[in-house]
Structures are given as structure tokens and as C-alpha cells.
Amino acid sequence: VVDLVNDERADVGCAAVTVDSRLARAAQRHSDDMAEREYLSHTSPDGTTFDERIRDEGHPRPAAENIAMGLSSPEAVMDAWMSSDGHRRNILNCDITTIGVGVNSDGWYWTQNFGY
């Protein structure tokens, strides 16, 4: 997914994002939580937001989050995100510098977390 993100960013003149382990942990934990509790939302059932999840992992500057479910390949999820104005805007935001991706294959829950 990260390579696909960077391909899209290169096409519009944005610098590549780099993987940040804190964003990756937050993304994986959110994908796992969504799969376990069977929901799809940027806010968990207990009210925790993506910004709070990222900061809880120690990342100081959360930027955005993309989520999806039901798509079983990186190409399929990226196609879906790039077909959505809001998700595409996050991916192609040239101010974003870091990324973390999580996926849970039980229902194919995906999370992309972005940071500055």
C-alpha cells in the first residue's frame, strides 16, 4: 500500500511518504479493533478518535486517516480510496510526510494513518 501511495503522490509532484512505526501501530490496532468489534468508523465505539489513537502511540502531529473494509488486496483498497474525493485528498496532500498502514484479513479492515 505504501508503494502505491507513493506512486500516486509522485504522479502529482508530492514527495514520498515514509513509514512511521507509531502510525503503523495505531493503524494496525484500529484495523484489529474494527474487525473484532465489527464496525467501520474513524471513531471507536468508546469514543476514541483517530487523532487520539495516533497521539497515544507517541506521534505528535496526526494529519488524517483513511479506512476501508471488504477489499482483499492493496490494489483494490487503493483504487477505492483514489475514487473517493476525501480519501484521495488525504493521499495526495503534499504536506503529509509519514504514513502507517494496518490491515486485518478477518473482513479485510484497512487503516491508513498519516502524519506531518
Regions found by a protein language model. Name each.
Residues 1-35:
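A short alpha-helix/helix-coil micro-patch that ends at or immediately precedes a cysteine
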Residues 16-18, 42, 62, 99:
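A local structural micro-motif
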Residues 24-74, 91:
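Short, surface-exposed glycine/acidic/tryptophan-bearing loops
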